[in-house]
């Protein structure tokens, strides 16, 4: 398990493609993070579910990314799921950190690595994030990287056996590129 970072110290994060040989490490990290994830996300917690997740990544309708620290340890996951092509070119953004990596800016770094890929390599036009209204940290995260609140979808996602309301946050490729351009000029 990682050593908590303090203040401005943030462990550098990089993206890594999930692979079959990661199953044991993922299942251990998920088990250690149950309390952290309870009621918010449902990551794969069995070998069968992990295999299914990998298969989805391979079918083109889903992009999965591991966030790994400088020691190669799993810090979190960023998924682009339910990819719709044609006139939409959109996907849903999902993410979570593992226990020991929360509140360190890890996910902010991770999303700043994934979004250029989403709007470049994956040729997406729009990303949407569904966030439970009480998840203040997640709301701040997406707002700080340029997502805009579009409304609330009532009882829209079933997590932990319960239907839960979710705020709908979104960003388009143009909005992302505009923010990136302004950051470079600053």
Predicted regions and their residues:
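Juxtamembrane/interface motifs at transmembrane-helix termini
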Residues: 44-48, 58, 96-97
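Conserved GNAT-fold acetyl-CoA-binding loop/helix
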Residues: 35-53
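Acyl-donor (CoA/ACP) binding surface of acyl/acetyltransferases
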Residues: 1-34, 68-186
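A short helix-loop-beta-strand connector motif used in the catalytic cores of GNAT acetyltransferases and
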Residues: 55-66
């Amino acid at each position: 398990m990682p050593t908590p970072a303090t203040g401005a110290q943030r462990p550098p994060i990089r993206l890594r493609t999930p692979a079959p040989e990661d199953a044991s490490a993922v299942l251990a990290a998920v088990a250690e993070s149950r309390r952290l994830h309870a009621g918010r996300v449902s990551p794969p917690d069995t070998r069968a579910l992990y295999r299914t997740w990998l298969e989805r990544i391979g079918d083109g309708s889903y992009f999965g990314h591991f966030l790994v620290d400088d020691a190669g340890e799993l810090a979190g996951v960023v998924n682009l799921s339910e990819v719709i092509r044609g006139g939409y070119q959109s996907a849903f953004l999902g993410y979570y950190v593992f226990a020991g990596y929360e509140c360190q800016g890890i996910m902010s770094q991770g999303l700043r690595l994934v979004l250029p890929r989403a709007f470049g390599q994956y040729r997406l036009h729009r990303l949407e994030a569904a966030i439970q209204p009480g998840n203040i940290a997640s709301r701040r995260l997406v707002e700080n990287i340029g997502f805009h609140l579009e409304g609330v979808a009532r009882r829209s996602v079933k997590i932990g056996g319960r239907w839960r309301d979710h705020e709908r946050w979104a960003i388009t490729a143009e909005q992302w590129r505009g923010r990136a351009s302004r950051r470079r000029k600053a």
